[in-house]
């Protein structure tokens, strides 16, 4: 039930970190993967990992915040692969700061990538999914979109918006057998968290009932579930992958 044989998955922000882990996980389940990011060098690394699993991988320099770039990218993917069965909207950025000091540019930059990007990619890919009367859209949100966080007004607003947008898309597309769900990760281990002082890491872990950072694979496993037929009766939901931070 967790197989994606003969499926084509489009993953944004696929060059490294969580996006790379998701792309590899979907390939492990049998999917061919269209990899989207602006970092061509790191994107090729992800492509190599997918190809090593025996599956097709193609790279696309898509700027998710630009409508023309997204439209061209989706058209190219549909031409190259013939279809898109799974869309994972993972691309995201942060520009943290207290709201009192946050510039309008920093607000716009985060909302443009994190929220507008999900809107643009979903809008571009949904037409083909509706026509084939099947598809799974998985949007990467965050527990910050559920609980808020000081110093992250732009990020919290963008991820809260992703959650609301996911529910709306689920309602609009369910009659065409296209599902849309969101994943809300908590603190996930990255090179950035690894570089933090041990005391800082310990304080962060105190907020997590499971007392550890999540691994990228923890999130990728949930994405695979939502992308596969194992979740055929699941739509409009938010699955928190946060070690119990949000209950």
Question: Where in the sequence are the language-model features?
Answer:
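Alpha-helical segment proximal to the catalytic Tyr-Lys
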Residues: 127, 171-175, 232
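A conserved structural motif in NAD(P)-dependent oxidoreductases
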Residues: 208-219, 230
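The beta1-alpha1 cofactor-binding region of Rossmann-like NAD(H)/NADP(H)-dependent oxidoreductases
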Residues: 40-41, 61-73, 104, 217-218
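Active-site helix of classical SDR
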Residues: 122, 158, 166
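Substrate-binding pocket helix/loop in short-chain dehydrogenase/reductase
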Residues: 98-99, 103-111, 193, 204
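Short, small/polar-rich loop/turn modules that mediate ligand/substrate recognition or access, typified
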Residues: 174, 179, 215, 234-236
């Amino acid at each position: 039930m967790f197989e994606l044989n003969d499926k084509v998955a489009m993953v944004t922000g696929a060059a490294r970190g969580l996006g790379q882990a998701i792309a590899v996980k979907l390939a492990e389940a049998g999917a061919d993967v269209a990899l989207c990011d602006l970092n061509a060098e790191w994107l090729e690394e992800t492509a190599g990992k997918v190809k090593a699993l025996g599956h097709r991988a193609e790279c696309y320099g898509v700027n998710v915040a630009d409508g023309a770039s997204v439209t061209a990218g989706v058209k190219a993917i549909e031409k190259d692969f013939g279809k898109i069965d799974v869309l994972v909207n993972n691309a995201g950025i942060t520009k943290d700061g207290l709201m009192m000091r946050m510039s309008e540019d920093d607000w716009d930059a985060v909302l443009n990538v994190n929220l507008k990007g999900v809107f643009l990619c979903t809008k571009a890919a949904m037409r083909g999914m509706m026509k084939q009367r099947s598809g799974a859209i998985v949007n990467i949100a965050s527990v910050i979109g559920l609980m808020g966080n000081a110093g992250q007004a732009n990020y919290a607003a963008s991820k809260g918006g992703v959650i609301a947008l996911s529910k709306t898309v689920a309602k609009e597309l369910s009659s065409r057998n296209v599902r849309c769900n969101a994943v809300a990760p908590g603190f996930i281990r990255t090179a950035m968290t690894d570089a933090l002082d041990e005391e800082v890491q310990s304080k962060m872990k105190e907020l997590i009932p499971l007392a550890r950072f999540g691994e990228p694979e923890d999130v990728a496993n949930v994405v695979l579930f939502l992308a596969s037929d194992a979740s055929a009766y699941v739509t409009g939901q938010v699955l928190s992958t946060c070690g119990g931070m949000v209950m």
